[in-house]
Amino acid sequence: LGRNKALVRAWPGVVEAAQLIGSDQIQGRCTIAGNLCNASPAADSVPALLAAKAKVVIVGPGGTRRTAVENIVTGPGKTSLGKGEIVKAIVLPDRPAKSGDAYLRFIPRSEMDIAVCSAGVSLTLGTGNVVKQVRVALGAVAPTVVLVPKAARAIVGTRLDDDALMKLTAACEAACSPIDDKRGTVEYRTEVAGVLARRAA
């Protein structure tokens, strides 16, 4: 994906997320659709795709259907795909002017590790560089990737001033319900998720 210059310009956060999945060998054989359908709460591509408002094209015995990315994963290792269905394509929307996206994750090692928590943000600026539209998604902090509308509402109509960003942070922290394991405590994941979302915005 990183070789597609138009895609990198339009959706740098999605491309960044995809390039963090596995090694070069894995990326040469696998797809971001596979990363989505693996249904891991910590999947790198999913927060970026949710923030981007991506759609998936599904084919199966009943024909072809289209749905939002957030409708695919229903729980850890579980999807809404029916028997015989596969994801044929992931479709990103046209990019409005004055828009950008970003994906950030925290991992204990430098590469090929599972995210302790992650955040994807996509936003569009309006007149006077005021935030017009935004979507915020968090990974590895709940059984599925979480879209956080309250975090988006916290910064719409602002110029990303400190007060607005702190409200976004608080909304992200409130949306977290992570597990407690050797890679991070509940409190740690919750705090870092808010920090990542603020930085991505």
Each language-model region and where it sits:
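C-terminal structural segment of proteins
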Residues: 1-201
